């Protein structure tokens, strides 16, 4: 391309539609609701097209051949990025760990499930320095196997193969992680505007929810200790908090740290000032490589990544118990790496020469440890576990295998989504197991008869709708947890959540259980209806009745096949994180938070995988169905509740109503008649945002039009069915 420049002071492109752009709306109005998170990963950004089915493509994969190629790669050291100790295994373990380790239980976001390590910000986080090289080493293999293996699956599988190639027996591997093609905009990584900032803490080192890392740009903890303070006990507190937020208990935490640090080394050959820009900030000729170093050769023995220069074991490319042997076998003193980072070395020169150099066979070293490694010895609870693993290597190996599998598969959802020949047969409690269907399913006539019995039970439409919603709306598209399947709404902890109105819920469930028992007892063919199915069917029957009340005959799609989980299959502590702190669809908020109710609504909608139109029609419909928590009348803008009309939108958009903040609460508003000043309605910020936000108002206007009442009902039913079936992966 010729690039003749006549006037260097002028840009030859008209600044109307440029890739860089000028100030965005969010630059001008930083508090504007971000509805873009509801429309991520559309077909417009997917080069594979809407017909592509990754699960079907993965089934064609020759996994054995792929693993053979990965095994060969482990020791095929490249001059442009030489392998430490002649083996890429430790680098690939770090890559897989850091892909999966962003997962947090609070909202289920992060994790390895979509291959987000390829994109900003993760590809340029300080904790991911030089993992760009690991992914580039994999490119020839990804190129060879194409769409039969996603990047997301390949990153995790490569970590598994790395472990196996160094003599470790893994617990298993499941494929099924489909790639996305753009960075995730829905994940809140923190409010800091500098790398390694930690404004996320308040009070007595209280970490902001839902974050699970101690500083911006780290996967979990600072290996030097809190803010670089080399205190193993203080570090242990951080470790326990952050690993718990990644769904790990103390035993799993010790196993993961010790197991991961059995292999490889950290890199701090020189001053970090030698390291250049991260991949996103790099020059175009770097082609996505980052952190170019001017220290020596910038690679091999001159590599600078974390700034720490630590080799833990005498056999860094072989599984062993040597991490614990060294941890307990030496007394440790504080020292500094060549880059000036705090780390630990054996006292009095002990251990000198027992550890190999990563690149020079003529050099030997003493073992070394991170502050966070010493936490496993000096924290009393961690020490007890570490000592047991030290004395029982088989227990350590089993614990690490299981914890590694959990780390790399936690965000995949239920076992039905696991693909491939290496899926372990053992059912694990953290997978939220649900019994398989072991009976004949109800048919169309049964469904009609059950609907009739439900509607004749005396339960009001509002309670049937709110119960079905409460059961299904726990679903999170982030980690595919929650949902109506399993009927866990009848079990602890969900049955006792405030948002679910426990007293009312118990009444509804008792009535539905009576209908279920009568139906099942009457069957001679082994046919049954589960309570999970009946709860959803009851809500759908109520929606149909409400539509009929409005003059619309419509059938809500229903697919039986849900089963009922037991309390023994339900980890109460694990499910506690699914409790909504807010559910704008039910006009519920548990407390006062730093972010607004309307932002919490958008977040909830995104977790439910809803679009902005689906969000809008659901809120409008649920309000007129009187489904608010506690039957609050805020936002019930209708004189005919339990009738599926577009009254919410008609009355919200009525210019005869003026809104003012209630004297009783800054979150509640009074809608007064402009002429008489009489109160017509009350509403929350959730309700009023559909008239205030320009995008949501545009959608509300569609549903408030006189010619869209039938469309409103159809769209509500479609969105309702989507939520009811959100966890029905068997229907996909």
Swiss-Prot record:
Q: Which Pfam families match?
A: peroxidase
The record describes how the cofactor is bound as: Binds 1 heme b (iron(II)-protoporphyrin IX) group per dimer.
**Catalytic activity annotation:** H2O2 + AH2 = A + 2 H2O; 2 H2O2 = O2 + 2 H2O
Record cross-link Tryptophyl-tyrosyl-methioninium (Tyr-Met) (with W-97), residues:
220-246
Q: According to its UniProt record, which residues of this chain constitute the active site?
A: 98 (proton acceptor)
Give cofactor(s), names only: heme b
Q: Does the keyword Protein biosynthesis apply?
A: no
- PROSITE patterns in alphabetical order: PEROXIDASE_1, PEROXIDASE_2, PEROXIDASE_4
E.C. no: 1.11.1.21
**Which intervals of the chain form a coiled coil?**
none
PTM summary from the entry reads:
Formation of the three residue Trp-Tyr-Met cross-link is important for the catalase, but not the peroxidase activity of the enzyme.
* The keyword Manganese appears for this protein: no
Example GO biological process = cellular response to hydrogen peroxide
InterPro entries with a match to the protein in the record: Catalase_peroxidase, Haem_peroxidase, Haem_peroxidase_sf, Peroxidases_AS, Peroxidases_heam-ligand_BS
- Stretch forming the signal peptide: 1-45
Q: Where is this site: Transition state stabilizer?
A: 94
Q: Where is it found, in Gene Ontology cellular component terms? A: cytosol
Tryptophyl-tyrosyl-methioninium (Trp-Tyr) (with M-246), cross-linked positions: 97-220
Q: Can you provide one Gene Ontology molecular function annotated for this UniProt record?
A: metal ion binding
Per UniProt, the keywords (alphabetical) are: Heme, Hydrogen peroxide, Iron, Metal-binding, Oxidoreductase, Peroxidase, Signal
Family, as annotated: Belongs to the peroxidase family. Peroxidase/catalase subfamily.
Q: Which NCBIfam families does its entry note?
A: cat_per_HPI, PRK15061.1
**Assembly and interaction partners:** Homodimer or homotetramer.
Protein name (Swiss-Prot/TrEMBL): Catalase-peroxidase
Q: Which organism is it from?
A: Rhizobium rhizogenes (strain K84 / ATCC BAA-868) (Agrobacterium radiobacter)
